[in-house]
Swiss-Prot record:
Gene3D superfamilies linked: Coproporphyrinogen III oxidase, aerobic
Ligand binding (substrate): 93, 109-111, 259-261
Single annotated GO MF: protein homodimerization activity
Naturally occurring in which organism (per UniProt): Pseudomonas syringae pv. syringae (strain B728a)
Family, as annotated: Belongs to the aerobic coproporphyrinogen-III oxidase family.
InterPro entries noted in UniProt: Coprogen_oxidase_aer (IPR001260), Coprogen_oxidase_aer_sf (IPR036406), Coprogen_oxidase_CS (IPR018375)
Site-annotated residues for Important for dimerization: 176
Signal peptide feature range: none
EC number: 1.3.3.3
Catalytic activity: coproporphyrinogen III + O2 + 2 H(+) = protoporphyrinogen IX + 2 CO2 + 2 H2O
Protein name: Oxygen-dependent coproporphyrinogen-III oxidase
GO BP term, example: protoporphyrinogen IX biosynthetic process
Pathway(s) served: Porphyrin-containing compound metabolism; protoporphyrin-IX biosynthesis; protoporphyrinogen-IX from coproporphyrinogen-III (O2 route): step 1/1
Amino acid sequence: MSTRTEAVKAYLLDLQDRICTALEQEDGSAHFMEDAWTRPAGGGGRTRVIENGTVIEKGGVNFSHVFGSNLPPSASAHRPELAGRGFEALGVSLVIHPHNPHVPTSHANVRFFIAEKEGEEAVWWFGGGFDLTPYYGVEEDCVHWHRVAERACAPFGEDVYPRYKAWCDSYFHLKHRDEPRGIGGLFFDDVNQWDFDTSFAFIRAIGDAFINAYLPIVRRRKAAAYTVQQREFQEFRRGRYVEFNLVYDRGTLFGLQSGGRTESILMSLPPQVRWGYDWKAAPGSEEARLTEYFLTDRDWLAEN
């Protein structure tokens, strides 16, 4: 393992620890269960899952470090020049599904990828981001989420937040339904336009920003009263989350195609979901406002 890879791995393990500790403290009753695993083809990871807490219905914060002699199709499809190279992939990926429909689901991921071939220069890049999926939108929360994202990006250039915000909006889009998964945030891949140290610093800034982006929203909404109907709507909207993860998500596809651990890969799926045939929200309802106002292409910071 190279010095670069060792530094990234140390950071990711520490990030996993810090996020788990913060989430446990916010929940107040549940604790993460750790499941260490190994991958027969090379590598392994630490899966951490929290379930049936006071605030968190189900969540996972996973670390993985896998390696192999050939890239899986999902990784080499848009980089065909890397076919036949050995690879190492390290990352922390998390999804939090709260009980309360007034608390959004959150997702974050930071990862490092390096592909090597004897006699040739190593090719490396970082990827990641974080995004928010509300069920009952609150403008204050959306602005806060994007403000934290913007501040994390600011030291690396004025164009970084707008570019990766737009990429997030484009990526987390359910093409078969022509609707966004949530209100976005940041998404980026193939980050190597800076030198390694700057690129690594950027990834650390994004990883470290997640708790500051999410926990204030959780604190504001976790005690809000909700009805059975609102809970059912949350489960209905969770269906969109499942559809995206199983059809489009690069991380899910990479994990399954590279022989990753299925239980860890599918940890992101919510515990209870519903699909209703051709269900429509009542005009003028909070449920209708979610798609009409919040799940649209908005510049949250320009408007506030």
